[in-house]
């Protein structure tokens, strides 16, 4: 049976600008969407102009003071927020730019809407390439990330799903997501990333395994410079298979940061676009409801190629290596192909012995897991997104969610042990 895929894209999200010289370029989202359109992939998906997340949505995870600050600060008034800029780590890596809160609202709303659609079985796979900002913390911005759309989406998924698996293939450790769920067995976090030599964010050692109820439900795979497709595959596939077998997630969130590709402006790995895509294809093969998000990626043309290719893999559609002509065609010079050679001269410092050592340690940690922790069943809290919204229909929107209804059995609703009032946050 073909997967039903929802794809979320806000036509304005690529127009935001972090500032001159900043490596994070939201414009990469416009390039990605253009390729998705010109390859005709949009015909195989339900395409939605996403919901905009509110301050209330963001405060599911973040502190009210921090979100209130993001909503109020602007380049014109930031001189009056000197203390807050320091407190909330907003400045160099995470600058104040025009429309900052609006940008956060758009990418977070799309991820949240994807989670809600998965909960309501409107789709089997939800894609938001604008999301995946995994470094943001409860009280502060970090690593180009302001609002952690991943954590907010997982909290929404936990209303219906007893166990959510989070997988991160960005070159940087998914520290914000790990920190949020470090003490719970409701979410298992698995991150493959560069570790050592003071590489940002400096966390993600394989001995960070979770604590309290979450002990051994946090898995880190620290890698060295220059890892290639073959080495990555030899670790990724057995580790993820073992995790899925042990944990039996009912939903998976996959962060597809493209800075793990070779030739990335801030990266030091040697993955090809096909190698990166293999990870996405492998996760999809488990046929578990899947939320697919973007993340890092700083060589814009290759980010667009990568996420377009991965969209095609999720749709099981073959697309040509020859790029279709589009308004951004010149970005892909000189070869104008989907799969250019992105290998670098960086030596693969991940020896067989090192990879085997990691694999053994990871598998030892997995043996400590309880198989598939169970969760007490409660009434489900109300949805973050109200399906009864009376917004005017958007003429640009291909599908309207109001058209989808599904009978729901009471025993489909999972929640934490202390939360059954239909109003408050999911207890983790």
From Swiss-Prot:
Positions annotated as active site in the UniProt record: 135
Organism: Tetraodon nigroviridis
Name of protein: Histone deacetylase 3
Function: Responsible for the deacetylation of lysine residues on the N-terminal part of the core histones (H2A, H2B, H3 and H4). Histone deacetylation gives a tag for epigenetic repression and plays an important role in transcriptional regulation, cell cycle progression and developmental events. Histone deacetylases act via the formation of large multiprotein complexes, such as N-Cor repressor complex, which activate the histone deacetylase activity. May play a role in the regulation of the circadian clock in a deacetylase activity-independent manner.
Residues binding 1D-myo-inositol 1,4,5,6-tetrakisphosphate: 17, 21, 25, 265
Ranges of Basic and acidic residues composition bias in the record: 386-405, 415-428
Main subcellular location of this protein, as a coarse class: nucleus
Family to which the UniProt record says this protein belongs: Belongs to the histone deacetylase family. HD type 1 subfamily.
Disordered: region residues: 385-428
Chloroplast listed as a keyword: no
Listed GO MF terms: histone deacetylase activity, hydrolytic mechanism; metal ion binding; protein lysine deacetylase activity; protein lysine delactylase activity; transcription corepressor activity
Residues the record lists as binding Zn(2+): 170, 172, 259
Listed GO biological process terms: circadian regulation of gene expression; epigenetic regulation of gene expression; regulation of circadian rhythm
Phylogenetic lineage: Eukaryota, Metazoa, Chordata, Craniata, Vertebrata
Locations listed in the record: Nucleus; Chromosome; Cytoplasm, Cytosol
Transmembrane segments: none
PANTHER family found in the cross-reference section: HISTONE DEACETYLASE 3, HISTONE DEACETYLASE HDAC1-RELATED
CDD domains: HDAC3
Signal peptide positions on this chain: none
Keyword annotations from UniProtKB, A to Z: Biological rhythms, Chromatin regulator, Chromosome, Cytoplasm, Hydrolase, Metal-binding, Nucleus, Repressor, Transcription, Transcription regulation, Zinc
Coiled coil regions, renumbered to chain: none
Enzyme Commission numbers on file: 3.5.1.98
Description of activity control: Inositol tetraphosphate (1D-myo-inositol 1,4,5,6-tetrakisphosphate) promotes the histone deacetylase activity by acting as an intermolecular glue between hdac3 and N-Cor repressor complex components.
Reaction(s) this enzyme catalyzes, per UniProt: N(6)-acetyl-L-lysyl-[histone] + H2O = L-lysyl-[histone] + acetate
SUPFAM superfamilies the UniProt entry points to: Arginase/deacetylase (SSF52768)
GO terms for cellular component: chromosome; cytoplasm; cytosol; nucleus
Region (Histone deacetylase): 3-316
């Amino acid at each position: 049976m073909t997967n039903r895929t929802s794809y979320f894209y806000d036509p304005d999200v690529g127009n935001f600008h972090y500032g001159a010289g900043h490596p994070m370029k939201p414009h990469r989202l416009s390039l990605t969407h253009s390729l998705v359109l010109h390859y005709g992939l949009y015909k195989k998906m339900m395409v939605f102009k996403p919901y905009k997340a509110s301050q209330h949505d963001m405060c599911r995870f973040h502190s009210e003071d921090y979100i209130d600050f993001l909503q109020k600060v602007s380049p014109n008034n930031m001189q009056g927020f000197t203390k807050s800029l320091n407190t909330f780590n907003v400045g160099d890596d995470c600058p104040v730019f025009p429309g900052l809160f609006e940008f956060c609202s758009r990418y977070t709303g799309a991820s949240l809407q994807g989670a809600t659609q998965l909960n309501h079985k409107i789709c089997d796979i939800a894609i938001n390439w604008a999301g995946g900002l995994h470094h943001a913390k409860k009280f502060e911005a970090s690593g180009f990330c302001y609002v952690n759309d991943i954590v907010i989406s997982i909290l929404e998924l936990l209303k219906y799903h007893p166990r959510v698996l989070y997988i991160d293939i960005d070159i940087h450790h998914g520290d914000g997501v790990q920190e949020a769920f470090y003490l719970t067995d409701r979410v298992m976090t698995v991150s493959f990333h560069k570790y050592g030599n003071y590489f940002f964010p400096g966390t993600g050692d394989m001995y960070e395994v979770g604590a309290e109820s979450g002990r051994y439900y946090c898995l880190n795979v620290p890698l060295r410079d220059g890892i290639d497709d073959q080495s990555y595959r030899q670790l990724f596939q057995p580790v993820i298979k073992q995790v899925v077998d042990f944990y039996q997630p009912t939903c998976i969130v996959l962060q597809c940061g493209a800075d793990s590709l070779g030739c990335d402006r801030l990266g030091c790995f040697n993955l090809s676009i096909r190698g990166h895509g293999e990870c996405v294809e492998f996760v999809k093969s488990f046929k578990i409801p899947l939320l697919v998000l973007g993340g890092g990626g700083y060589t814009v043309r290759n980010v667009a190629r990568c996420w377009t290719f991965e969209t095609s893999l999720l749709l099981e559609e073959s697309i040509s290596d020859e790029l279709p002509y589009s308004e951004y065609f010149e970005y892909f010079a000189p070869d104008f192909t989907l799969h250019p050679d992105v290998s670098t001269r960086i030596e693969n410092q991940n020896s067989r012995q090192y990879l085997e050592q990691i694999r053994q340690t990871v598998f030892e940690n997995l043996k400590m897991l309880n198989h598939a922790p169970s969760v007490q069943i409660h009434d489900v809290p109300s949805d973050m997104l109200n399906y009864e919204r009376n917004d005017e229909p958007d003429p640009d929107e291909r599908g309207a969610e109001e058209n989808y209804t599904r009978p729901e059995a009471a025993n489909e609703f999972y929640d934490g042990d202390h939360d059954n009032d239909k109003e408050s946050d999911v207890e983790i």
